[in-house]
Amino acid sequence: LSEVPLRNGRRADLMGIDAKGLVVIVEIKVARADLLGDAKWPDYLDYCDRFYWGLPPGLDRAPLESAAYRPETCGVIVADGYDAEILRPAALDPLAAAR
């Protein structure tokens, strides 16, 4: 699903359920400035079991390796209009049962 409203007032770019029934959120960034200027993405973490950054091919992924972007937690997907590849799997951080 795209543009999914969350209870905290944020809106997830993409949200889905994987084959194991886990909730996955993908925050899409198409430009370096968009990626570097996003301070709201941690607000999504309480609403998913796995969180990914979705990027187009060619976008500099170096910022995602810094501690500010939690590389130990957040996965990276690179996609174009035809295909997608998980370059770094997201860590499992199970949702609280109340969510």
Predicted segment positions?
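Active-site-adjacent loop/helix micro-motif of nuclease/hydrolase catalytic cores
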Residues: V24-E27, R32-D43, R61-L64
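Short, polar loop motifs at secondary-structure junctions
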Residues: L55-D60
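Glycine-rich, phosphate-binding/catalytic loops in enzymes
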Residues: W41-L45, Y69-R70
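A short acidic/basic microdomain associated with nuclease active sites
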Residues: L1-R7
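Non-catalytic C-terminal interaction segments of nucleic acid-processing enzymes
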Residues: L64, A68-R99
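Active-site beta-strand-loop-beta-strand hairpin of nuclease catalytic cores
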Residues: N8, A12-I25
